[in-house]
Swiss-Prot record:
Role noted for this protein: NDH-1 shuttles electrons from NADH, via FMN and iron-sulfur (Fe-S) centers, to quinones in the respiratory chain. The immediate electron acceptor for the enzyme in this species is believed to be ubiquinone. Couples the redox reaction to proton translocation (for every two electrons transferred, four hydrogen ions are translocated across the cytoplasmic membrane), and thus conserves the redox energy in a proton gradient.
Native source species: Bdellovibrio bacteriovorus (strain ATCC 15356 / DSM 50701 / NCIMB 9529 / HD100)
Record PROSITE patterns: 4FE4S_FER_1 (PS00198), 4FE4S_FER_2 (PS51379)
An annotated Gene Ontology molecular function: quinone binding
Keywords linked to the UniProt accession: 4Fe-4S, Cell inner membrane, Cell membrane, Iron, Iron-sulfur, Membrane, Metal-binding, NAD, Quinone, Repeat, Translocase, Ubiquinone
Gene3D superfamilies named among the record's database cross-references: 3.30.70.3270
The name this protein goes by in its record: NADH-quinone oxidoreductase subunit I
């Protein structure tokens, strides 16, 4: 036995709801169509958004003026990383004044949350989060950055140089 329910109360609000949603959509469509100067959308990639200087993008390993890595393989960045995306393999250096250095330094960008903990933990300013953020690629191997990708780029797209002068750091109190 089936029971018929009276849905007349609900059905009388159906058409006004549809018309109200349609009116809102048409209002925004016409506003954006005829007033494109105030539109918030950028035509990417022709127009690029200007990010703040404090923006944290892709990682950069800094090098000294002699071309050697600033990293001392202390593992503080890898220890502080909440995503565990930094892998460092350390080795002893030939120079007795240098304790160790990284022979392998990899960052898995797909796991990274760009929190900046690695940058804050580094005692020698060896890792920075630079201005680049676009990382195109088709497979996961393209997103594991090694020492060559992280450090040996003469000039990044934001004007940040990868080499750091020790004298300037000491003057600044870093």
């Amino acid at each position: 036995m089936s029971v018929m329910q009276n849905n007349s109360e609900k059905s009388k609000w159906f058409l006004p709801g549809i018309l109200g949603g349609l009116a809102t959509t048409m209002k925004h469509l016409l506003k954006n169509l005829f007033n494109q100067k105030k539109m918030m959308t950028l035509n990417y990639p022709e127009e690029k958004y200007e990010y703040s200087p404090r923006f944290k993008g892709n990682h950069v390993l800094t090098v000294k003026k002699d071309g050697s890595l600033r990293c001392t393989a202390c593992m503080l960045c890898a220890t502080n990383c909440p995503a565990e995306c930094i892998k460092i393999t350390a080795a002893e250096h030939n120079d007795p004044t240098v304790e160790k250095f990284p022979i392998s330094y990899e960052i898995d960008i797909l796991r990274c949350v760009f929190c900046g903990f690695c940058e804050e933990a580094c005692p020698v300013d060896a890792i920075r989060l630079g201005p680049e953020w676009q990382t195109p690629g088709v497979n996961g191997a393209n997103f594991i950055y090694d020492i060559n990708h992280l450090a040996y780029r003469p000039n990044l797209k934001g004007g940040i140089l990868t080499h750091v002068d020790d004298e300037e750091r000491h003057k600044a109190g870093i």
